[in-house]
Amino acid sequence: MNILLANPRGFCAGVDRAISIVELALEVHGAPIYVRHEVVHNRFVVDDLKAKGAIFVEELDEVPDSAIVIFSAHGVSQAVRQEAKRRGLKVFDATCPLVTKVHMQVARASKKGTKAILIGHQGHPEVIGTMGQYYNEQAGIFLVETVEDIANLPIHHHEDLTFMTQTTLSVDDTSGMIEALKNKYPAIQGPRKNDICYATTNRQQAVRELAKQAQLVLVVGSKNSSNSNRLAELASRMGVLAKLIDGPQDILPEWLDNVETIGITAGASAPEILVQSVVAHLQTLGATSVANLVGCEENMVFEVPKELRVREVK
């Protein structure tokens, strides 16, 4: 039984930055540091930061006045920012810069009075934050999850219209949605290329290559991780048994029946230590070789806030 590792896999630049912001804030200011929502969607990462003194909350009313709070990588609405300012909270913003780019697109549409359509998953923190950048009551922003949602949009063809997407979607699904939007609204405007982030795109391409050679694909990532779920779905669509796991403890021996090659990848919020723990566990179950697929190199780095960067240099 062989193990094949996808490349690239695991942490992206936005996740690296978000985790660094929490760790550096704890180092500079000491515990407790409050974090609104899980800074990234991975249970292992969140538990590790809790042990270091981070306190995770869902809403700002759980944060004491004048405390330090970090916004998660998924971003927040303008209403949340305004509440933090009103209460005198010191904020470090760990929003992924690629999410911030989408926020700016929405804010521009709102300012111009252009109706906006967001392709995304209802209830996901990134979507909530992105929708919350639109404040023009004379126009509006609409969320669509399916082609059927697009067919039912109550927007006239002659209206000014723009679209944007959640950054962690399936590339294949999103291209079909964009095509449906352009068919219904030929004059619709949008980004020059879709908003799906480089890391999501790269990991989806890597899992395609993995699924061509493996009979089982294990995706290391938490159940609430959008990009991890998309990786498992993509491998499954290619006819391969695919399982989303938090770690080696989730692996069932029967998954390995008649399997010669196991492919392993990890979502953008899953640390490499979890991948290696899965490899080690599979070796105890009979895996004899480990190889890395050749994939694209990622060199993207996002800087942490200046106040924390000074400390980082020291």
UniProtKB/Swiss-Prot annotation:
Residues engaged in binding dimethylallyl diphosphate: H41, H74, H124, S225, S226, N227, S269
Pathway connected to this protein: Isoprenoid biosynthesis; dimethylallyl diphosphate biosynthesis; dimethylallyl diphosphate from (2E)-4-hydroxy-3-methylbutenyl diphosphate: step 1/1; Isoprenoid biosynthesis; isopentenyl diphosphate biosynthesis via DXP pathway; isopentenyl diphosphate from 1-deoxy-D-xylulose 5-phosphate: step 6/6
Superkingdom classification of source: Bacteria
Binding site for isopentenyl diphosphate: H41, H74, H124, S225, S226, N227, S269
Annotated GO biological process: dimethylallyl diphosphate biosynthetic process; isopentenyl diphosphate biosynthetic process, methylerythritol 4-phosphate pathway; terpenoid biosynthetic process
Known cofactor(s): [4Fe-4S] cluster
Catalytic residue list: E126 (proton donor)
Note accompanying the cofactor annotation: Binds 1 [4Fe-4S] cluster per subunit.
Class of enzymatic activity (EC top level): oxidoreductase
UniProt keywords, alphabetically: 4Fe-4S, Iron, Iron-sulfur, Isoprene biosynthesis, Metal-binding, Oxidoreductase
Similarity comment text for this entry: Belongs to the IspH family.
Functional description taken from the UniProt entry: Catalyzes the conversion of 1-hydroxy-2-methyl-2-(E)-butenyl 4-diphosphate (HMBPP) into a mixture of isopentenyl diphosphate (IPP) and dimethylallyl diphosphate (DMAPP). Acts in the terminal step of the DOXP/MEP pathway for isoprenoid precursor biosynthesis.
Name listed for the protein in its UniProt record: 4-hydroxy-3-methylbut-2-enyl diphosphate reductase
Species assigned in the record: Haemophilus ducreyi (strain 35000HP / ATCC 700724)
Gene from which the chain derives: ispH
